[in-house]
A protein has these predicted regions:
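Active-site-proximal helices and loops of the catalytic beta/alpha 8
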Residues: 239-248, 256-257, 262-273, 327, ...
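Aromatic/acidic polysaccharide-binding cleft in carbohydrate-active enzymes
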Residues: 139, 382-383, 435-471, 487-525
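C-terminal beta-strand-rich structural cap/linker in extracellular carbohydrate-active enzymes
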Residues: 31-33, 592-618
Length: 618
């Protein structure tokens, strides 16, 4: 039986994907004659406590050999998630979503399709679209000022930049992340030419505020740069110098918790006798929940006593973060291009909306990104479906689903499965959000891409097993080829690619802290960097990579062939995971060869007489 319905196919659903509130959606069914008489209805339900299914009768559109065609138009008025299937109104049959997104006939309830409806005025920064990001873990990138004195005696300086980060428990059995390699803001400034040569447009910096750990997710002072990284003035200099290279700086905002060792909480007493922990009358006391039922006597992030959670609805905290002259306002006016919100799905929607207001008050072109590990439109939290991607909260999110699908594909996952997973995210996310989603293969929270591709899975084994591991020889060589393929996909999918520092030279490492080693500046691995530079140049020059629609032409036998369809240009990308050369037909009717474990990109001007530009990057 042929496909009855597929929301990824423009014949069956127009427009593709999410829609603005008030926009009309056209749906078409293709019913084989063998199903007999049917009277199909669209059954549509908005998700909500008081919402009920609404039935829309579909009109007969005509016949093709052995098939009857029916369609319906529906206007979706309010932002939210809508779910739908089709009732055939005969013999209790319905058409529900099958495993490959195609409609299948069922006599019982099944999976529905989703339509995301977002705010009609939702816009995201145009300056982000079509660009390239680069993530830096500040302590581990580059030491611009050498032999700096440690600002606090409990910080341990690591002079050997090739050393493995500390991973063994200290004398108390804990991991305090007290080893510092000395990376700083001046080191980032020095490397701006290197970054621009790779086509980098934005730097996403892991936390840079004053904090007493090398990762700095335990904020001690929201309004000052960590002294080992530099000063507030040096941050402003970095922003100005980066702007000369066309590079913006996006900061990491950690607002779900502070450090216990902070001027706000001050459990350790570093900041005198003040702070919420030591002083019941502290102005910060209301930021935290103190109760003997909690470990340590206060609520903490996932039970880590060094990370006391804040009440994000406390007026004084909200004002401190989002008010005029507050944390967001201060850093954007110092030169930052935006914020990435740590654990965004653990922040209340109302708080995120106030952060958005603070960001856009400075400029609509300032960027607000959220850390969400799953499909951000379907996340539950605080006893309800999260709404932060519908136009009043985040601009976009970190695209972990793409990362997982791309890495699994280059390792051997069926191409069709990877394509369906990617299309699902593209379908669910509002266009302004998918066009600014941060696409990556490695982060400070995940294993490095080359390790995932080429090394043995950790499978829950601990740090002792992970320590010192790396692949060499044939496994490394093949891994680099597969990594090259993976980045070709990441650079050409909807969204903006983000390169994690060191991936370009084949750095390896399992999870924290092994994925956070110091950048190996004396590495001789130079094969991937020019490829990334060419991919970045292509993104900058081809408008299809800014907002072009994704359309998959073929996904089988290790071949992933897709288009990005822009207003004036169409880019066609063919990725060949197989071990032999393929000859692939293009949408234009011509053919192109694609090397084993390689890729080819063809850019055409839209129109009757397109100009062809072939990019087979070696």
């Amino acid at each position: 039986m042929s496909c009855l319905f597929n929301s990824y196919d423009p014949y069956f659903k127009q427009p593709f994907g999410a829609v603005r509130a008030g926009q009309s959606v056209h749906l078409t069914l293709c019913i084989p004659e063998e199903l007999g008489y049917v009277d199909p209805h669209l059954v549509l339900q908005k998700e909500g406590k008081y919402d009920v299914p609404v039935h829309y009768r579909m009109k007969f559109d005509g016949q093709t050999p052995h098939q009857n065609h029916f369609s319906v138009d529906v206007v979706l008025g309010d932002p939210g998630l809508y779910f739908y299937y089709f009732d055939l109104y005969t013999d209790f049959r319905r058409i529900v979503r099958g495993a490959d997104n195609c409609g299948v006939v069922s006599w019982q309830e099944g999976e529905s399709w989703q339509i995301t409806v977002y705010e009609p005025d939702f816009q995201t920064p145009e300056c982000i679209k079509g660009k390239v990001f680069y993530q830096i873990f500040p302590d581990r990138f580059c030491e611009g000022i050498e032999n700096k004195p440690m600002p606090f005696p409990d910080r341990l300086y690591q002079a050997d930049k090739h050393a493995e980060p500390f991973w063994q428990p200290n004398e108390t059995g804990g991991h305090l992340n007290e080893d510092y390699f000395g990376g700083d803001l001046e080191g980032i400034r020095i490397k701006l030419p290197y970054l621009r040569e790779m086509g980098v447009d934005y730097l996403y910096l892991n936390p840079s505020f004053d904090a007493h750990s090398n990762h700095r997710y335990n904020t001690a002072d929201y309004l000052n740069v960590d002294p080992l990284l530099g000063t507030n003035e040096e941050f402003e200099v970095l922003c100005r110098e980066a702007a000369k290279y066309g590079i913006g700086i996006v900061l990491d905002g950690v607002f779900s918790h502070t450090g216990s060792d902070s001027r706000y909480f001050n459990r350790e007493g570093r900041y005198g006798e003040g702070g919420a922990y030591r002083d019941p009358n502290s102005p910060y006391r209301s930021w935290y929940d103190f109760d003997p039922k909690y470990k340590g006597g206060y609520r903490s992030w996932w039970g880590f006593e060094t990370l006391p959670e804040v009440n994000e609805e406390t007026p004084s905290f909200v004002e401190f973060i989002t008010g005029e002259g507050g944390v967001i306002d201060t850093w954007l006016r110092r030169g930052a291009a935006g914020f990435r919100l740590d654990v965004a799905d653990e922040l209340p929607d109302e708080f995120i909306e106030k952060i958005r207001t603070a960001v856009k008050r400075v400029s609509p072109e300032k960027f607000l990104l959220g850390e969400v590990w799953e499909d951000a439109t379907t996340k539950f939290g605080f006893d309800h479906r999260r709404t932060y991607l519908l136009g009043k909260g985040l601009d976009s999110v970190m695209n972990y689903p793409f990362k997982n699908s791309v890495l699994d594909f280059v390792k051997g996952k069926p191409a069709q499965q990877a394509a369906n997973e990617i299309l699902s995210i593209c379908e669910h996310y509002p266009a302004p959000a998918i066009n600014t989603a941060l696409n990556f293969l490695s982060t400070h929270d995940t294993e490095r891409a080359l390790t995932v591709i080429a090394d043995e899975p950790a499978n829950g084994r601990g740090r002792e097993w992970q320590s010192g591991r790396s692949v060499t020889g044939e496994a490394y060589e093949e891994g680099m080829l597969r990594l090259r393929m993976a980045y070709a996909i990441i650079y050409t999918l909807p969204g903006v690619p983000c390169l994690y520092y060191g991936d370009e030279i084949g750095m390896q490492g399992y999870r924290d802290p092994f994925n956070r080693a110091f950048f190996c500046w004396d590495s001789h691995e130079e094969r991937l960097r020019p490829v990334l530079a060419q991919l970045a140049q292509l993104r900058h020059s081809c408008e299809a990579f800014r907002t072009g629609e994704l359309r998959v032409l073929r996904a089988e036998d290790g071949i992933l062939h897709y288009q990005r369809i822009g207003k004036t240009e169409t880019a066609e990308i063919i990725v060949n995971r197989s071990e032999h050369i393929i000859v692939e037909p293009l949408a234009s009717g011509k053919h192109t060869e694609v090397n084993p474990m390689g890729f080819t990109i063809v850019v055409e001007e839209n129109g009757h007489n397109p100009n062809h530009s072939y990019y087979d990057i070696q």
